[in-house]
Design a protein with these regions (language model features):
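Hydrophobic alpha-helical scaffolding
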Residues: 29, 57-65, 69, 96-101, ...
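Extracellular/periplasmic catalytic domains that process cell-envelope and extracellular macromolecules
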Residues: 30-33, 40-41, 103-104, 207-208, ...
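C-terminal edge strands of extracellular/lumenal beta-sandwich accessory domains
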Residues: 103, 108, 113, 199-203, ...
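Extracellular S/T/G-rich loop segment that most often corresponds to the catalytic His/Ser-adjacent loop
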Residues: 1-80
Length: 315
């Protein structure tokens, strides 16, 4: 089997500010140790034509961004087609598509959850990922803080991994599942919780020993416009007010357990608007996902998007 890897370009690395350049670098990264990189995409050593018609090398995020936005456009086109098909189906058939498919939180959860981290060996245990991403010092995602620390959802340099349009399509096309009944191995949902409440998603088949499970939870920080002139849009001189971030947590649990202290793994960052779990299953069996609205900083009800990808012995 051909091993495929890609190391991030040095010029585009993100890292915690340290040393003599810390004062300058502090201005370039998120505050409070929040992860500024969510996703990476190919943008180095590209051959592009300049205005003179000559092929020249190009590097940078400006060339990586179109791959991400293009993937979103493809997913939205597919989602709209599913919504149009839904309107022609008999009333007794309930397709897994609603207008939630257009929400930006859903797109973010789908892209992050389907990103490539470590190449699959061909047995599907690594969820069919197509390449291994390498950060500085040639370390992969399994060697990152994000893999081993429950309070760190994303890697500083790799984020959740490299965007993969085909895997994003597979993640998104699986459809929406509310959690009211057992959910399939791959899926997504948009929902809202009141403070203190939680929502469980019971996976309908036992997870395979040695397989990985990928879970991503996304929601928004509440930022409001100080609308001085009352025209409900930004005007020169007006400012935006940060009302803070509600605190949601994400847990992977055995199906029969109910206390979060019994969770197999969790993502419980206090500063990020994303929680992410990429965890290897040591004990095969039935599992469930739990989303918990732990603390309200602004509004007492919070919308969120969840995406999951897992593997059973029968896949």
């Amino acid at each position: 089997m051909l091993f495929r890897s890609r190391k991030l370009d040095f010029s585009n690395l993100s890292e915690a500010p340290v040393g003599t350049a810390k004062k300058i670098e502090d201005l370039e990264v998120n505050a409070n140790n929040r992860r500024s990189i969510g996703l990476v995409a190919p943008g180095g050593n590209l051959r592009l034509y300049n205005l003179a018609g000559k092929a020249v090398p190009a590097n940078g995020t400006s060339f990586a961004a179109p791959l991400v936005t293009g993937t979103v456009a493809l997913l939205q086109e597919f989602g709209d087609r599913q919504l149009r098909t839904k309107s022609t189906l008999p009333a007794n058939i309930k397709p897994r598509w609603t207008l939630d498919a257009r929400r930006h939180e859903v797109m973010k959860a789908v892209l992050l959850n389907s990103a490539d981290k470590v190449q699959d060996n061909g047995d599907g245990l690594r969820l069919g990922m197509t390449r291994t991403m390498l950060a500085k010092n040639n370390r992969d995602w399994l060697e990152s803080e994000a893999y081993s620390d429950r309070q760190i959802p994303l890697d500083y340099q790799l984020g959740a991994g490299q965007v993969n349009a085909d895997r994003a399509y597979r993640q998104f096309s699986s459809g929406q599942y509310s959690g009211a009944t057992p959910v399939p191995m791959i899926g997504w949902n948009y929902h809202a919780l009141d403070v203190g409440a939680y929502q469980d998603y019971l996976i309908d088949r036992p997870l395979a020993e040695g397989s990985f499970v990928s879970l991503t939870l996304t929601w928004d920080r509440l930022v409001e416009l100080t609308d001085i002139d009352g025209n409900q849009e930004y005007s020169l001189g007006e400012e935006f007010r940060d009302r803070g971030l509600n605190h949601l947590d994400l847990y992977l649990m055995h199906a029969e357990d109910d206390r979060i202290s019994q969770s197999v793994w969790s993502s419980i960052s206090k500063v990020d608007s994303v929680q992410h779990i990429f965890h290897q299953i040591r004990d095969p069996g039935k599992y469930k996902i739990r989303v918990h609205f732990r603390q309200a900083v602004n509004l007492p009800r919070q919308g969120y998007a969840l995406a999951w990808w897992s593997r059973s012995n029968n896949q």
